[in-house]
C-alpha cells in the first residue's frame, strides 16, 4: 500500500513552520496513542504514521530531501544509495510526550528549550548559461542575527539571566482543574526557567537584532528551476543562543531567446530556406559552447529533428551530458524580386502532371484523399 503524504498525515501545509508541525503531532498523539485509544483498531498504525511524519518534517535535512524526492528519498538505495533512514529511531520525542502526557498526568518537569532560528528563503534568478555552467553570486538578505553586545544572552554585559521566581527554574507551573493537576508553561518566563532582569540596551533582552548580511552562494553546474540549495546555519539566529535556522536558495532559470530546456536536453528551432531544404547543404547552429556546423540532407521537411549529442546540459548530480536537438523550420521566402518570382513560376509549372506528383508525394496523397472524401459524399 502506498504511503500517505507526510504533510497530509499531520494535516499541515507544505510551508508549515516547525511549531505548527509539533502542534499537529501533539494532537494526533493524544488521539491515537495506544494507551489512550481502545476503540479504534487502527489507532496504533495511525500513531506510528504520525510519528514517522513528525520525525521527517522536524529534521531540516530530512524535510528538504522529502520535499525534493518524496518517499523515495528514504527507500533502500534512494538518494544515491545512502539517503536518510525513514520512520525509524533516532528522533528525540521526549519533548512531545513530556508536553502531551506530562500536561495531563503531571509529569514532564523540564524547561522549554530556546527556539531554533527560523529558516529563510531567497529566490535567485539565473540565466540559462549560469545555470548550465555554475556560478558564484553574492546575495544580501535581511535577517535576525545574534546581538554582538550580549552575544545572544539578552542580558546586559556584566549581568546574567536569573532563575524565574515563579517556577523556580522548572519552566512549568501546576494548576489544579477538578480532580487533575495540570502542568503548563510558566507565564512569567514563558517556559524558559530564567528571566532577564537587566536587559541588553541594544537588543532589549531578545538576544537578536535585525540586520542585513551578504553571503557568497556557489551555484553548482546543471541546476534547474525548482532546485533548492541549503546553506546550513545561515537563517535567523536562534533565541538566546539556540541554533540558527537554515537559508534555502530557490532557483529560477530565466527564459532564453534561443534555447528551451527539458531536463538535461536543450531544444532550438533552426530556420532554413526552401532551396536548402530541397537540395541540402550545411549551416552553422548555436550551442552553449559556440557555433558548430550542421549538415542538412536533401529533401528535408519542416519538423525534422537533428540531435547533437553531448551539447546539452551536464546533470547536476554528475554523469552523462544531455543533447541539443535542433528542429528544422523551412521558411517561406518573402520580399521576392520579379526575377525570383518568375523562377518560382517556372518551377511551379514543372510540378504539373506526373512529374509533379513525384516531386510532391504528400500533396498528391492529400489531394487523392480529398477527392475520395467528396466522391463518398455524392454516392
Swiss-Prot record:
CDD domains for this protein: DnaJ (cd06257), DnaJ_C (cd10747), DnaJ_zf (cd10719)
Keyword vocabulary terms for this entry: Chaperone, Cytoplasm, DNA replication, Metal-binding, Repeat, Stress response, Zinc, Zinc-finger
Details of cofactor binding: Binds 2 Zn(2+) ions per monomer.
Binding of Zn(2+) 2, residues: 164, 167, 186, 189
Region forming the signal peptide: none
CXXCXGXG motif repeat copies, ranges: 147-154, 164-171, 186-193, 200-207
Alphabetical list of SMART domains matching this protein: DnaJ (SM00271)
Alphabetized Pfam families for the sequence: DnaJ, DnaJ_C, DnaJ_CXXCXGXG
GO biological process, one term: chaperone cofactor-dependent protein refolding
Family according to the record: Belongs to the DnaJ family.
HAMAP family in the cross-refs: DnaJ
Descriptive protein name: Chaperone protein DnaJ
Organism listed in the record: Yersinia pestis
Amino acid at each position: 500500500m502506498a504511503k500517505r503524504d507526510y504533510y497530509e498525515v499531520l494535516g499541515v501545509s507544505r510551508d508549515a513552520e516547525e511549531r505548527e508541525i509539533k502542534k499537529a503531532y501533539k494532537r494526533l498523539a493524544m488521539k491515537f496513542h495506544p494507551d489512550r485509544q481502545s476503540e479504534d483498531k487502527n489507532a496504533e498504525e495511525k500513531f506510528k504514521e504520525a510519528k514517522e511524519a513528525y520525525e521527517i518534517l522536524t529534521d531540516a535535512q530530512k524535510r528538504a530531501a522529502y520535499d525534493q524526492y518524496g518517499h523515495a528519498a528514504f527507500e533502500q538505495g534512494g538518494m544515491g544509495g545512502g539517503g536518510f533512514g525513514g520512520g525509524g529511531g533516532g528522533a528525540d520525542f521526549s519533548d512531545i510526550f513530556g508536553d502531551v502526557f506530562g500536561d495531563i498526568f503531571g509529569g514532564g518537569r523540564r524547561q522549554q528549550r530556546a527556539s531554533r532560528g527560523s529558516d529563510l528563503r531567497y529566490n535567485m534568478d539565473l540565466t540559462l548559461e549560469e545555470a548550465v555552467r555554475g556560478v558564484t553570486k553574492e546575495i544580501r538578505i535581511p535577517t535576525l542575527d545574534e546581538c554582538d553586545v550580549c552575544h545572544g544572552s539578552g542580558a546586559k554585559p556584566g549581568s546574567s539571566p536569573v532563575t524565574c521566581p515563579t517556577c523556580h527554574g522548572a519552566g512549568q507551573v501546576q494548576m489544579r482543574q477538578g480532580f487533575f493537576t495540570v502542568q503548563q508553561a510558566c507565564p512569567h518566563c514563558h517556559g524558559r526557567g530564567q528571566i532577564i532582569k537587566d536587559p541588553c540596551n541594544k537588543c532589549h533582552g531578545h538576544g537578536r537584532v535585525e540586520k542585513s548580511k551578504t553571503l557568497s552562494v556557489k551555484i553548482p553546474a546543471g541546476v534547474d528551476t525548482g532546485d533548492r540549495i541549503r546553506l546550513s546555519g545561515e537563517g535567523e539566529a536562534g533565541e538566546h543562543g539556540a541554533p540558527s535556522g537554515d537559508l534555502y536558495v530557490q532557483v529560477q532559470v530565466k527564459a532564453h531567446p534561443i534555447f528551451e530546456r527539458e531536463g538535461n536536453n536543450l531544444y532550438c528551432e533552426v530556420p532554413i530556406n526552401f532551396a536548402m531544404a530541397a537540395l541540402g547543404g550545411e549551416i552553422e547552429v548555436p550551442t552553449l559552447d559556440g557555433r558548430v556546423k550542421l549538415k542538412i540532407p536533401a529533401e528535408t521537411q519542416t519538423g525534422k529533428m537533428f540531435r547533437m549529442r553531448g551539447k546539452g546540459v551536464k546533470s547536476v548530480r554528475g554523469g552523462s551530458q544531455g543533447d541539443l536537438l535542433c528542429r528544422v523550420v523551412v521558411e517561406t521566402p518573402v520580399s521576392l524580386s520579379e526575377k525570383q518570382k518568375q523562377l518560382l513560376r517556372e518551377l511551379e509549372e514543372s510540378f504539373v502532371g506526373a512529374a509533379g506528383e513525384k516531386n510532391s508525394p504528400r500533396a498528391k496523397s492529400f489531394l487523392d484523399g480529398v477527392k475520395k472524401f467528396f466522391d463518398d459524399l455524392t454516392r
